[in-house]
Structure formats: C-alpha cells, structure tokens
C-alpha cells in the first residue's frame, strides 16, 4: 500500500454535513484495508482566490495509507460531490503522523508566524531600506540637478 496526503475544500454552507462526508470517505479508505494516519479539520479559512464566487472554505487534511484503486474511488467521490470545491492528492514516501504547522498555529491561537517578529515586515527603523543618497549614482544626479537649477535661475 502507498502513502498519500489528501487536502480538500468544502463549501462553507455545507460545514454541517462535514462529519457525514468524513465518515463516507473513511469507509471508502478502510474498506480495502487502508488506514488514516492523520486527520485534521482546519476549519473555515480564507481562500487565496475566489472559487465559484466564494471567499472562504472549510479545509480538511488527511494522511492515509491505501491502494491506488482506493485513491481513484476517493477522488471520484470528491468529483461527484458538489460540496467539495477543490481536492489535491499527493503521493508520499512515508506516513506523516505529526501535527501540521497550520494545525499547530491553530492550537496556539496564533496565525502560525514567528511571535518574535510581532507581525512586522520591516525592521525597527520603519523605513523601506532607503538610507539616503546612494553612493556614486545619487551624487552625480544631485550635482546635475543643482547645475540645472542654477541655469534656470540665470535664464530668468
């Protein structure tokens, strides 16, 4: 049997039926002797781009061990279920059982980023990295600008 990582997105209005869908998918996997190593419900999250005019979806991650025939059956179940917006199946070399970084971020109550940065993208100076005149280039430009300004004053 092979190891797979499966992520699928469920329509946000169908979140109540998620447990029934999970039972159906679990039954498909376990019928052929497969097993689920990790099952994480990431909840309702913002989408990176709209899908069918929706901006949020319910995310579910599964790491499973099953036969390729079972994966075909599972993907066809996703395809014929209108509540599943997207699915992705990736073949893995080994079973992944530890908690995903996204689920760890949910457990700690944060967004999963480094708290030492405190959510800032820039350094403490607050600037965009511009420290004044650039050596060589800006000196020449500033000299040209002052020469041009002096010429315009003389012509007036």
From Swiss-Prot:
GO terms for cellular component: cytosolic small ribosomal subunit. GO terms for biological process: translation. Residues 117-126 have a biased composition (Basic and acidic residues). GO terms for molecular function: small ribosomal subunit rRNA binding; structural constituent of ribosome. Keywords: Ribonucleoprotein, Ribosomal protein, RNA-binding, rRNA-binding. Pfam families: Ribosomal_S6 (PF01250). The keyword Transport does not apply. Binds together with bS18 to 16S ribosomal RNA. NCBIfam families: S6. This is Small ribosomal subunit protein bS6. The gene is rpsF.
């Amino acid at each position: 049997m092979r190891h797979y990582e499966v992520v699928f997105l469920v329509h946000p209005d169908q979140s109540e039926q998620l447990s029934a869908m999970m039972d159906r998918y679990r039954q498909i996997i376990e019928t052929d002797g497969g097993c689920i190593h990790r099952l994480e419900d990431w909840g309702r999250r913002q989408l990176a781009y709209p899908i069918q005019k929706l901006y949020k979806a319910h995310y579910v991650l599964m790491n499973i061990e099953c036969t390729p025939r079972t994966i075909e059956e599972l993907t066809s179940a996703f395809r014929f279920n209108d509540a599943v917006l997207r699915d992705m199946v990736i073949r893995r070399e080994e079973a992944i059982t530890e908690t995903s970084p996204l689920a760890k971020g949910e457990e700690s109550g944060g967004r999963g980023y480094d708290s030492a940065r405190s959510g800032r993208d820039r350094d403490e100076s607050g600037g965009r990295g511009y420290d004044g005149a650039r050596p060589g280039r800006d000196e020449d430009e500033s000299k040209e600008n002052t020469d041009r300004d002096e010429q315009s004053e003389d012509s007036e």
